[in-house]
Amino acid sequence: MTPLKISTEQMIVLHGFFAEAAAVGEDELAGITGCDTEVEVQEIRATALSDFSERGLCLSDDLVAGVMGRLEGRVPGTISLVLEPEDALLWARLAGGDDPLGAFVLLASTLLQGVTDALGGVLDGDAAFEGARLVEEPELAMLVATHAPSDTIVFSTQLRIDARDEVLTAVSHLLVEWKYLAQVMSALSAAHH
């Protein structure tokens, strides 16, 4: 596999994209929880799946609570959002109701749909987030379970979610196969300029 080389300028573009994408879902998240919600990108890292255990941006080596689904459209892939189980439950309780697991899936799916919509916008094509499901396992196991090729690029974004005086840390993972990387980076760079 060719070593992953993403320039500083490209990382800045990626950071800007994910910050804008996360902001897309803030109003919907506020509607679900009944309080202002701010999502801030704190760090982003791009790593080949084969190197993720050594170099990837990971919330925890232990069990995490995540929502994972397929990214369909011009650039197919997988997208997920993970939190510590206690934080996932706390976030879900902000939404109220009798089904905290369902609330967590709804909240995470809303945030991931914002990323999907933003990606569809820069790729000038359809993008859909489908098959959202709750996953509880270590992040590496979650990513490997996708059966993506080892050269798949994992764009990991550490997020700070502020809602109702609670601050939660989450990590989003977007898996894009190597063969689509140039297309994604070109579209993001064009949208940035």
What name fits each language-model region?
Residues 2-193:
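Composition-driven recognition of glycine/serine/threonine/acidic- and proline-rich low-complexity segments
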